[in-house]
Amino acid sequence: MKKVVNENQKSTLRKVLRYIRRYWGYLGASIILAAVTVALTLYLPILIGQAVDRIVGKGAVDFAGIFVILRKMAVIIGLTAVAQWVMNACNNKITYNVIRDIRTEAFEKIEKLPLKYLDAHSYGEIVSRVIADVDQFADGLLMGFTQFFTGIVTIFGTLIFMLTISVRIAVAVVVITPVSLFVASFIAKKTFSMFKLQSETRGEQTAFIEEMVGNQKVVQAFSHEDEALEKFDEINERLQKYSLRAIFFSSITNPSTRFVNSLVYATVGVVGAFTAIAGGISVGQLSSLLSYANQYTKPFNEISGVITELQNALACAGRVIELIEEDAEVPDAEDAVDLEHANGKVELSHVYFSYVPEQKLIEDFNLSVKPGQRVAIVGPTGCGKTTLINLLMRFYDMNSGTIKVSDIPLQQLTRKSLRDNYGMVLQETWLRSGSIRDNIAMGKPDATDEEIIAAAKASHAHGFIKRLPEGYDTVIAEDGGNLSQGQKQLLCIARVMLCLPPMLILDEATSSIDTRTEIKIQNAFAKMMQGRTSFIVAHRLSTIREADIILVMKDGSIIEQGNHEELLEKNGFYAKLYNSQFAKTS
């Protein structure tokens, strides 16, 4: 287990370094400036030692020499401040460029992920990786640049300056150093696994909170508050446990290294005092050595804290990099062509598909749709209606068989051009933040106001839009929170009305609309579907009576096929389903 964790940590670090290497210019400047800053800082104890010797040395106090030293110190302090400012600017540039790159790649990957990945992971957990985990990583990376590099340079620089004063004392310091390194290394291995668990649980908690907040009406309607709170408490307890363990191991790093570093300071003081008494060094040089001992041990204390932050940062980076490295949707074939304008002909031949290998869903599915035909798909929940739509849009690839559009197999078409030829209105509405005008024009950004208004009128959305205070300029809240479900659905229909592609998919498109509005929408749909191949998924059979073909599906297969009158005459599954829905009105 330890070996696996260590390998994961190293692998993540290598991947992070690949991002950092893109900005080698800033990195090189930062390292050089760190060396300059440390060199200037370490020169100060030399000057202080010289000043001490001019005060405690034989004869009168050398005030002139002291003033010269003070002027040098003032210049050095000023240069150090400037160098540190520029170094921090370089570090910030590296950190936030890397964060930008990682977030961009993560978002690009999300848009390329196959639907099966998005179906298997909650969107809250994915958002947590891109936002919270990247923020945690940024904090650790910035601290790593600002303190880790400077600390390392300070350690080696201090030893060099100490060697110029007393080789024996410098060697004594080097002998004690490995103890501090061993302590920090031992604890670092313990903290990484805990921070990884903490990060994963934080993502789980974020996903759960977003799920509950987004569906609070349903939670309250079913009196599910106690169960939700119990589940949240369980996740929260685990997060607390992992957080405490991570903090426990990280908290003992600093005291442990401080103890070892105190030994270093004491060693320099004792050995230096005896050396000064013996005449090996002056009092001023002893003062310089004690200052160096303090500066030498200080980075170990800081680095121990940095290591803790880096453990957390690497754990978080591992989660977002894991997302970036997920297999993307199977790319278009190299010889794939664009479907310029579909003629509406669709053929499915011996199509097989399953989400899970051992559970067959679509089996030996065959269908031939002529241009302009309206195809309705009905059946019980789980029969494969939405799955069939997913295959037509190539959100999923079939296991075997052939699907052709305009006599061209889907695999020979680019996904974008295929999907551009479909207009979709789904049961689940999605509106982006922005004005109503922007949402309607989503598929046609260059649409004129006249075109947008015409589309809204065709979908019967114009009336409620004009009643809003800002009309078409009304800004929609997140996911259309300030609109009713029916109003959101009307805007989604208007969006398709504006583009009017050659083929349409209506998946429970009127499920959230009242009966009165539904009649108007059906008339609008009838006009919209004229001359366009249309696939209509519906539970309410009143919406599909005018379809050219009605497919009755069960367990992934077509069990009945025909128009409304033909299926009623067969007195089969469709007839029973239809009669059950209209029993009260008959």
Give a label for each model feature.
Residues V75-L79, P178, I209, F259, ...:
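Hydrophobic transmembrane alpha-helices
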Residues M1-T41, V56-M73, M87-N91, T95, ...:
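Membrane-integrated ABC transporters
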Residues H224, F248, Y265, Q295-L323:
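Cytosolic ends of transmembrane helices, especially the final helix of ABC transmembrane type-1 domains
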Residues L17, L115-K116, A132-L141, F145, ...:
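An intracellular "coupling" helix at the cytosolic face of ABC transporter transmembrane type-1 domains
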Residues K2-N6, Y96, T104-S128, A132-V134, ...:
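Short intracellular "coupling" helices and adjacent cytoplasmic loop segments at the cytosolic face
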Residues D332-A333, L339-S586:
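ABC-type nucleotide-binding domain
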Residues R22, Y26-A39, Y43, Q50, ...:
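Transmembrane helices of ABC transporter permease
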Residues L17, G25-I46, I69, M73, ...:
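Alpha-helical segments in transporter systems
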